[in-house]
């Protein structure tokens, strides 16, 4: 049951079952960090791994987790239990694949018996002059092995053709070291090669001589079906080669002898430990194909595929989703579901080349906590769900479910926190505003007005910014979201220079909008106000006094010269400077009306007296002289304003 569960989970998760483990018995109350620590302590020495899924199983009464490793593992190193919360957790994995002998050898097609050893052994295992017995292996008249015979002078056993030390088969069938296919061992020693292998006519073995037709090479140049003795001279199924291509120790020729009636190989008929195989061991590890064995061929075939697939497996990281768990933890802020689901949809479009199984697998890898449990439960019930269906299900569970009235109340009651900056508050307020617009609680056409109203009501802007925003509100031209953020940034940059703000210098980035030509021409001089020498401090004090006088002055509706528009607002009454009356030290103060972003905190632009034009001074002089002419009682000399500076 556990193995079936492992295979099922790997199938719908798209995991490799050979590299995966199933952990059972995890208590339901086990915390996530406890699970991670226990798994890390037990499995991290084995290599890189990842937890694909973990959820509760009713039939087990506990949680189960699926873990996949990056590489194949040795089953003997995998722990069968993991110590954890509530007792040891059982580890389930597929059994080790049995190691089959010669599994690395390529499967060559069987060749018809009786073929020459040269064809069976290929280039490396050909008999040539030494391997193919032919005239040499026939043992001649004396049953010897000729030049390359199995035993040479010592191996020839007289007329009987004994096998000698090399254990040839029959009188002349012994091929010795060279008779069995040379050093490549293609034919073994029991049958020298080809049709004439082993004994020939003079081998004393007759027609059923030591190797016969099949005694030479067998199917693959080895030793026939079992090796060295062929059909008649061999030893049946368990003949000369056995499984290892050898001759066995005493069964190379069977109990009846490897050479039939005349094949005197001793009573045991054994070809010796080296019999029927020779030094090359007819089947050996090289598989009777000589030095160019099949192992090298297999490795050469696998290597290009490994080089091609390795980069593909390593470069999958760029397609991973950002993690999402919806787990509420103190001090851990996770991105909103709306932001994550948009990112997930974009990634699904990039994964268009991948199969649906891979898409679901990559989606599950990015999930955790409650989000992972939701999707895992859905896929367990219906494995045919697509990745988009999983995202839709997550949206139904985790998407904001606020009603129309709730979203409106959240927006209207949003206040600036004690340690929260104005910029961050406006950004947070915008999210609530957009959510209220989506729910239909706020008309989109009124969004800018409501945003500005909330900032003025529930935020803490500076005095200068508050005056600017109230002016925009009165003029019914509220800024947009980006415009408000830009205004806040400019105000923060302006406030970063206290010297300029204290001296009443207007904002550097904002142009001055005024209909007074003197103010418009004097605005470029504001940057040099702080560098005007000792008169700068006097000008600042005079500007402050002028501002107080302008605020406390009565309504100018008594005379014709009262300012009735922006032109009048651009002029102010000069004041008496007690510290001197020199024209070089007098300053002309100009009041700038707040018409836009140029409205500064102090609203004053300082201009040196000698830089100002004469028409504004003459206008001021006219305003000062009119009250003097209207006074019928006559004023004393001490009550008349000083006008010597204009003459």
UniProtKB/Swiss-Prot annotation:
Region (Disordered): 111-199, 227-254, 508-580, 608-647
InterPro entries (UniProt xref): PNMA, PNMA_C, PNMA_N
Acidic residues bias: start-end ranges: 625-636
Compositionally biased region (Gly residues): 122-149, 158-199, 227-251
Pfam families according to UniProt: PNMA, PNMA_N
Coiled-coil regions, chain positions: none
Protein's name according to its UniProt entry: Paraneoplastic antigen Ma6E
């Amino acid at each position: 049951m556990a193995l079936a569960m492992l295979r099922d989970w790997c199938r719908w998760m798209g995991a490799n079952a050979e590299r995966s483990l199933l952990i059972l018995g995890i208590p339901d109350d086990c915390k996530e960090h406890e699970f991670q620590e226990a798994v890390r302590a037990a499995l991290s020495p084995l290599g890189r791994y990842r937890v694909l899924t973990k959820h509760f199983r009713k039939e087990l009464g506990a949680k189960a987790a699926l873990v996949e490793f990056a590489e194949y593992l040795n089953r003997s190193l995998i722990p069968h239990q993991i110590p954890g919360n509530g007792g040891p957790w059982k580890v389930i994995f597929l059994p080790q694949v049995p190691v089959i002998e010669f599994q690395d050898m390529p499967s060559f097609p069987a060749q018809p018996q009786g073929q020459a050893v040269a064809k069976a052994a290929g280039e490396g295992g050909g008999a040539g002059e030494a391997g193919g017995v032919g005239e040499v292996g026939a043992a001649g008249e004396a049953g010897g092995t000729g030049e390359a015979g199995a035993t040479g002078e010592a191996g020839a056993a007289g007329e009987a053709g004994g096998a000698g030390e090399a254990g040839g088969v029959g009188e002349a069938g012994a091929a010795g070291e060279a008779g069995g296919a040379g050093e490549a061992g293609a034919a073994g020693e029991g049958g020298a090669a080809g049709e004439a292998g082993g004994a020939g006519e003079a081998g004393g073995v007759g027609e059923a001589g030591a190797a016969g037709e099949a005694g030479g090479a067998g199917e693959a140049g080895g030793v026939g079906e079992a090796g060295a003795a062929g059909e008649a001279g061999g030893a049946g199924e368990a003949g000369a080669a056995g499984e290892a291509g050898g001759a066995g120790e005493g069964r190379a020729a069977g109990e009846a002898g490897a050479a039939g009636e005349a094949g005197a190989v001793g009573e045991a008929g054994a070809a010796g430990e080296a019999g029927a195989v020779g030094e090359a061991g007819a089947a050996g590890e090289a598989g009777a194909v000589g030095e160019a064995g099949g192992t090298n061929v297999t490795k050469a075939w696998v290597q290009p595929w490994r080089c091609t697939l390795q980069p593909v497996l390593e470069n999958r990281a760029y397609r991973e989703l950002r993690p999402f768990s919806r787990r509420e933890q103190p001090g851990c802020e996770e991105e909103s579901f709306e932001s994550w689901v948009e990112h997930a949809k974009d990634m699904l479009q990039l994964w268009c080349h991948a199969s649906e199984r891979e898409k679901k697998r990559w989606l599950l890898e990015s999930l955790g906590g409650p989000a992972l449990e939701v999707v895992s439960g859905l896929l367990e019930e219906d494995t045919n769900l697509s990745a988009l269906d999983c995202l839709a299900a997550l949206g139904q569970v985790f998407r904001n479910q606020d009603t129309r009235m709730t979203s409106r109340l959240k927006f209207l009651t949003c206040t600036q926190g004690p340690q929260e900056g104005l910029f961050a508050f406006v950004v947070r307020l915008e999210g609530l505003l957009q959510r209220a617009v989506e729910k239909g609680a706020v008309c989109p056409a009124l969004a800018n007005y409501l945003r500005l109203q909330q900032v003025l009501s529930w935020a803490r802007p500076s005095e200068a910014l508050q005056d600017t925003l109230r002016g925009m509100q009165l003029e019914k031209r509220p800024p947009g979201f980006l415009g408000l953020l830009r205004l806040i940034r400019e105000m923060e940059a302006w406030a970063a220079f206290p010297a300029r703000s204290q001296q009443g210098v207007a904002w550097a980035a904002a142009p001055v909008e005024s209909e007074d030509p003197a103010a418009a021409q004097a605005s470029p001089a504001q940057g040099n106000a702080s560098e005007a020498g000792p008169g700068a401090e006097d000008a600042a004090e005079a500007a402050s006094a002028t501002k107080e006088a302008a605020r406390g002055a009565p309504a100018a509706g008594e005379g014709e010269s009262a300012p009735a528009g922006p032109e009048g607002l651009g002029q102010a009454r000069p004041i008496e400077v007690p510290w001197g009356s020199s024209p070089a030290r007098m300053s002309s103060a100009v009041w700038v009306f707040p018409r836009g972003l140029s409205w500064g905190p102090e609203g004053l632009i300082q201009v040196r007296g000698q830089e100002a034009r004469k028409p504004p001074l003459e206008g001021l002089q006219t305003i000062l002289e009119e009250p003097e002419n209207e006074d019928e009682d006559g004023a004393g000399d001490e009550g008349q304003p000083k006008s010597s500076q204009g003459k």
